[in-house]
Amino acid sequence: MLDLGWSEILVIAVVLIVVVGPKDLPRVLRSFGRTTAKMRAMAGDFRRQFDEALREAELDDMKGLVDDVRKLDPRSEIRKHLSPLEEAGKEIRSGLSEAAKAKPAASSLPAADSKPAEPLKNGATSLGPEAPPPVTGETAAPKVSEKAEVGAVAASPGTSAKQAAPKAKAAAAAKAPTKNTASAPAKKPSPRRKKTAGTAP
């Protein structure tokens, strides 16, 4: 507290004896001792109150930390960090389902437009060169989709190049234009002649 050496204490004692006098010196020393004790007690109380306030503040901080730990739910934290991954997964799934829906719809359109082949008539072995049917908006669209479907069959990810070629040829053969019965004029059957008994053919 005060750095007083023996020589300094001796100087203070001599000054007190001279100033106060030998008669009143014991009473002054007692009052000085009491005052010093009171000041020490007050300093101790202040220190205790200050330490107590610090402990309460630390306890409040500790209580806050304990409450935070109790409120901490690791599952919610993990969900919060994984939610972007879930959203990305949902986007991928929706994209795949849309692609899967689009592929069957594209392959079903050319199948609906195909027409059955006309059987050969009168023992003919092949169809002769005839003029192709007139191209309209309805017949032009299947040809474009036929090429797209042949390309899709050839480029499907599950087939190799050797497997894709026969599939493409088979698809092209199945979609080949056939003779349209509605475009050719219908032949009228020749009228039958009545046979009479008196005429020779």
From Swiss-Prot:
GO cellular component annotations of the record: TAT protein transport complex
Entry membrane topology: Single-pass membrane protein
Statement: the UniProt record of this protein carries the keyword Protein transport: yes
GO biological process: protein transport by the Tat complex
Gene3D superfamilies recorded: 1.20.5.3310
Compositionally biased spans, kind Low complexity: 102-114, 159-187
Pfam families listed in its UniProt record: TatA_B_E
Predominant place of localization: membrane
NCBIfam families linked to this entry: tatB
Record note on quaternary structure: The Tat system comprises two distinct complexes: a TatABC complex, containing multiple copies of TatA, TatB and TatC subunits, and a separate TatA complex, containing only TatA subunits. Substrates initially bind to the TatABC complex, which probably triggers association of the separate TatA complex to form the active translocon.
Protein name: Sec-independent protein translocase protein TatB
Species for this entry: Chelativorans sp. (strain BNC1)
This protein's encoding gene: tatB
